[in-house]
Amino acid sequence: MEYVDTKKGTNLLMFRPIRDFVRICLFFGLVLALPAGPAAAAEGVQDLLPDSRAVRGSGLITAAWLGQPVRRYGHGVLGDRIEGGTLYARLTNGRTIGHRLDSRSVFEDLTVRLADLNGNGQDELIVVQSNLEKGSALAVFGLRAGRLQAIARTPWIGTRNRWLNPAGIADYNGDGVPEIAIVRTPHIGGTLQFWQLAGGELVAKGEQYGFSNHRIGSRIQDLSATLDWDSNGIVDLLLPEVGRRSLAIVTLSGGTARVLATLPMPAEVRGPLTLDAGGRTVRVPLENGEMVTVSPER
């Protein structure tokens, strides 16, 4: 295969790097998006955290968002030192409920993710929670007896001002139960981890070192995409490696996280990565202003 230079904006962008010639393409497969897509501002949302997004749900929870801006952490990894103090959910009956954190932690995130993690037909709420002394953890909340309650949480990273960024939610190992993919410390040699909710706890399912799905200070968190890269019926994860000058396709098939392929980029990945409506094309904005369009090979 060889590189072919094309203009920006074409359906398939192939570019000439410094070294060898290789075509960048994605094998078409099933693409799983998050169960609730982001909305700029869901109808009826109040107390929305600045520069954050509400998400819509199709079940009992019709919308979820972060609010009650607080300044007690001061990390500023997402562009300012304002974080969320309360997690909100609006229900089908129009009622809005919330879970307010105590003074020892914040929601260091810009969007809530909705997904049914345990197969009970009801979405859980997935968000990054940061402790003022111990850094970040992935937290799962759920609707219990009409209230938002904490269900499970990964261990704190253990050091103040250490953060993690979610990368995807899908059944990455093919066992019929979704995993949550995160990159732990994406700015200092990130580790990709897969977690699954089981028995009321988040259980580690695999990890692989060497990824970065965020640029420090950026509000763009969506630097990943989920798709079936190797056409084996099990979805994989596409995300940048450390330095964000290449993309990796990681599989959890077989129970072990491993890299299937790497795709060099002509500049650092900026994001957000987006999929077309059919899940056939991934658009990858770069820091130099170019847009790399990655499509299935025909």
Q: What does each of the following model-derived ranges do?
A:
Residues 1:
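The two-metal-ion catalytic cores of nucleic-acid processing enzymes
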Residues 4-6:
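Short hydrophobic alpha-helical segments enriched in small aliphatic residues
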Residues 10-14, 37-40:
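Short intrinsically disordered, low-complexity segments
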Residues 11-26:
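Bacterial N-terminal signal peptides that target proteins for export
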Residues 24-35:
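Bacterial N-terminal signal peptides
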Residues 40-298:
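Beta-propeller-forming repeat regions
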